[in-house]
Each structure stands twice: as C-alpha cells, then as structure tokens.
C-alpha cells in the first residue's frame, strides 16, 4: 500500500510541475484537476475516505466550473502544449531544481521509502476525518455558521458586480 502512496506522491509532484511549466490554460486546468484527484487518492489511501471524497467532490464540482470558464475565455488558435520548446524547457528547469534541492537537503541522492508515515500506536475506533467532522459541528460550530454567512454574502456581491445597467 505504501508503494501506491509513493507512486501517487510522485504523480502529484509531476502534475504540479506540469501546471507550473505554464502551458495553455486548457492544459493547465487539466493538470490541476488530475493533481487534485491524485491528492484525494493519497488522502483516501491513508485512511481518510470521507475527507478524500468530500474534497474531491468540492474541488471538481467548484473548481471545474472555474477552469471551464477560464479555458473558454482564454482560447488560443495555437495553444501551447507540454511538448513545446518553452514549456518543455520550463519543465526541465523545474526537474533540475527539484533534483538539486533533493540533493542539498538529503546530503545524497537516495531513493528510500519511509514506512513510518503514521504512528498508529493503539487501535482507533474512528478515523480522523470522522472526528474532524464532529468537532467542526461541536466546537467549531460558530466557524461553520460564519463561513456559511460569508458565502451567502459573496453570492450577493457577485450578483451585484455582474448586474447589468438596466
């Protein structure tokens, strides 16, 4: 299972590097959506099934609309892909910087996997995500109400900004 998490972590870093190499907005949005799915897969494989599902639904439900809108507004006749020279050069520079940082902080380049990721000393009846939801409703109830109120006001601000001159 840890090999799977390790593979997903590598895919997450590669997805963020694919976004940071500045391709066309269409490909940038695609790499962010795929990276979000991989990140939620990491959370699910580490035991946070509820949290991973909620983040996946919120991320893809909310942000996919934004990505679709920006991709429609920023259409190009010849979009830059990941194999174009400037984008590929940026990607190679980031891979080189990642290798230098890895070498600098580790002292040597060593491909080892730390299996002691979570310290599970005792038996847990509930996962951390269920405890977090119950704490949000109990101790953090005022934060939940405040966040809902802010979102409610945001709707009115957006409607006022986008309102026509009629």
Curated annotation (Swiss-Prot):
Question: What GO cellular component entries does it have?
Answer: mitochondrial inner membrane; mitochondrion
The GO molecular function terms of this record are:
NADH dehydrogenase (ubiquinone) activity
EC numbers, comma separated: 7.1.1.2
- Indicate the principal place this protein occupies in or around the cell: mitochondrion
Q: Which reaction does it catalyse?
A: a ubiquinone + NADH + 5 H(+)(in) = a ubiquinol + NAD(+) + 4 H(+)(out)
What parts of the sequence cross the membrane? 1-21, 26-46, 47-67, 87-107, 139-159
User: Which terms are listed as keywords in the entry?
Assistant: Electron transport, Membrane, Mitochondrion, Mitochondrion inner membrane, NAD, Respiratory chain, Translocase, Transmembrane, Transmembrane helix, Transport, Ubiquinone
Biological processes per GO annotation: mitochondrial electron transport, NADH to ubiquinone; mitochondrial respiratory chain complex I assembly
Q: What's the protein's topology in the membrane? A: Multi-pass membrane protein
InterPro entries, per this entry? ComplexI_Subunit6, NADH_UbQ/plastoQ_OxRdtase_su6, Nuo/plastoQ_OxRdtase_6_NuoJ
Give compartment(s): Mitochondrion inner membrane
Name the job this protein performs: Core subunit of the mitochondrial membrane respiratory chain NADH dehydrogenase (Complex I) which catalyzes electron transfer from NADH through the respiratory chain, using ubiquinone as an electron acceptor. Essential for the catalytic activity and assembly of complex I.
- Quaternary structure? Core subunit of respiratory chain NADH dehydrogenase (Complex I) which is composed of 45 different subunits.
Instruction: Please report which protein family the annotation says this sequence is part of.
Output: Belongs to the complex I subunit 6 family.
The protein's name in its UniProt record: NADH-ubiquinone oxidoreductase chain 6
* UniProt gene name: MT-ND6
